[in-house]
A protein has these predicted regions:
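C-terminal regions of RecA-like/P-loop NTPase motor modules
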Residues: 1-6, 14-20, 27-28, 197-241
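Conserved P-loop
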Residues: 2-97, 104-105, 109
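Phosphate-binding/switch region of NTP-binding enzymes
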Residues: 25, 139-223
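Amphipathic alpha-helical transducer elements in NTP-driven molecular machines
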Residues: 31, 76-84, 97, 124-143, ...
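An acidic- and aromatic-residue-enriched active-site/binding cleft used to recognize and process polar
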Residues: 56-58, 103, 153-154, 196
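Short, conserved acidic/polar surface loops in the N-terminal third of protein domains
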Residues: 65, 108-114, 160-162
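Glycine-rich, phosphate-binding/catalytic loops in enzymes
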Residues: 70-71, 114-118, 166-168
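Conserved P-loop NTPase nucleotide-binding/switch module
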Residues: 100-130
Length: 241
């Protein structure tokens, strides 16, 4: 085997785009939290920065239009190609901040396709095919030159806790996003939001800003994300490397 040569360089942090996941049970405040984060990021990017919102919830995509300034693409189909086309539409129009609300519909689409393609009990090939389709959108999000906030419904479970009257009562909690296994680890920060308190806990945090904190996600959180991501050397083009 011929000798392989490597170039050894000093590691330096480079500026990157924010890529985060907000998950939680239905009613926990994922969409609202995503809009607050996006508003904080957009303010840091600069005056006139527009927020693009890729929605899958029909009329619910417009619930907060009186509180936040954002432009909307409502998806009518939930295949990876539709998600990717919507991202490209915003990128081509110059948007620097994008919300995808939510990715759960994509995962439901994947599961539906597997069911349709399965013959007998052999789901292995179908899962292999459509998990690759699912991975396409993840790669698109991670490589897109824009700050992207993704939401996903949590895998709901119920726990018994004492209520305000001291009686044990069931409470719905999210235990990971309704997405492919370990998908939360693809993002810079992944939060799980509590349904009752709307408080978010970072279950994975590359920034170390949110570790050990349980808080409401707001514009200040978005500003902190942007500042961390923008702290570093400008990314060089391939020709400059």
């Amino acid at each position: 085997m011929a000798k392989i040569n490597f170039t050894i360089t000093k590691a330096k942090k480079e500026q990157i785009c924010v890529k985060v996941l907000v998950s939680g049970p239905s009613g926990s405040g994922k969409s609202y939290s995503a809009l607050r984060l996006a508003t904080g990021i957009a303010g840091r990017v600069g005056e006139g920065t527009k927020i693009g919102y890729i929605g899958t919830e029909g009329m619910r995509d417009k619930l907060y239009a009186n509180e936040f300034d954002y432009d909307l693409i409502s998806l009518e189909e939930y295949s990876p190609d539709y998600y990717i086309a919507a991202i490209d539409a915003f990128l081509d129009a110059g948007y620097k901040v994008i919300i995808i609300d939510s990715m759960t519909h994509l995962w439901n689409w994947v599961q539906d396709q597997v069911q349709l393609q399965t013959k007998g009990d052999n789901t292995f090939q179908a899962w292999g095919k459509y998990k690759k389709e699912n991975k396409k959108i993840i790669e698109k999000i991670l490589l897109a030159p824009a700050h992207i906030i993704v939401t996903a419904r949590g895998k709901d479970e119920y726990v018994l806790e004492a209520n305000s009257r001291g009686k044990m009562a069931p409470r719905k909690v999210g235990v990971g996003a309704q997405q492919d296994k370990d998908i939360e680890y693809e993002y810079m920060v992944t939060w799980m939001i509590d349904q009752d308190t709307h408080l978010a806990e970072a279950v994975k945090d590359n920034t170390h800003i949110f570790e050990g904190k349980i808080q409401v996600l707001d514009e200040k959180s978005g500003e902190a994300l942007y500042d961390w991501a923008n702290d570093g050397d400008p990314v060089k083009s391939p020709a400059q490397r």
